[in-house]
Amino acid sequence: MKFAFALAALSTALLAAGPARAQPALAEIKVSYQPALYWALPFYVATEKGWWAEVGLKPEFSTFPAGVPQIAASASKSWDVGGTGSVPAVLGHVRFGIKTIGLTNDESAGNALLVRKDVADKFTKDPASMKGQTILLTANSTGDYAVQSCLKKYGLTKADVTIKNMGQAEIISAVSSNNADLAGLWAPNIYTLEEKAGAKVLCSGKEGSAMVPGALIARGEYAESNPENVAKFLAVYLRAWSWLNANKPQAIEMMTKFYAQGGVSISPASMMKEFTTRPTYTLAQQLTAMDRTRGTSNMDGWFADIATFMRGTGAIQSIPASADYVTDAYMKRVQADPKLREFANRSN
């Protein structure tokens, strides 16, 4: 009897374990980003909501202070997919074969040239007086691109000023301590300097007529070998934006927590400004931006302008064809899969 009871118990346990064993294992995917940035918020939201597992992914995150070290880390395969600025995305293609697979946001207004409050009136009234001055910025970044577009707006060139390459935290410290007058920053660092030191935005990338897109990226080798995982990654990212844009009060709450993790504290008003000044893209809008049915796409043009700027700075030697690295193949996979498409567009 004892044997029979034990056998029955074992059979029951095996039956109970059967369905659990049948569940497919989650696919690990290494996701890279820069902390406490607007376009990286979807990664945090998706994790808090448990959406990665819903599509069969298990993310492993790595963060970087800026795009250049992030791109360099791809050489050791320390990440598979992620988000970055458009300038490092182009650099990543040239140096490491990285693919641009989508857009994080339009951050044209989120990259700017700022001026210290004590000299704000001087440079606002006479921007040309920046000639001969020193501008602190992070080289080969979207902030660099925005600053140079602003200089062009005012009839100046990079040769007319002294550029000093520094990290964003160092720039904030220098301006706050009155050791610098002019600086190139991206949001939310812009808001930090405005709120903590009273700095003023002299000119944004948008005001300098520069389109500054943020990029979703993937290592070329990984994307080629794991196209389904890349499509799932995109679907998760898009769903997070769908939810964020439909639930602003909760979005601000989550942004507050996410920014705090990266040591950033800005006012709710500045957080809302992130949403109102930096458009994001639905699945349909992503596909429209990448559409080449009539020739070059909008994204092709934006990234060609970025590459032209980079050749001018000496970061790259020639301008690569956008079609060599900007690809809609993975967004199209999301669109073609009914489940992923519905998931990406879900706002709850």
Residue ranges and their predicted role:
Residues 23-167, 181-187, 203-204, 210:
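Short, glycine-/small- and polar/acidic-enriched structural segments
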Residues 225-317:
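Secondary-structure end/capping motifs
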Residues 49-50, 72, 76, 90, ...:
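Solvent-exposed, polar/charged alpha-helical surfaces in well-ordered, non-transmembrane soluble domains
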Residues 18-22:
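Sec/Tat signal peptide C-region and signal peptidase I cleavage site
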Residues 119, 170-268:
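Pocket-lining segment of extracytoplasmic ligand-binding domains
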Residues 302-348:
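Conserved C-terminal helix/tail region of periplasmic/extracytoplasmic solute-binding proteins
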Residues 4-16:
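Bacterial N-terminal signal peptides
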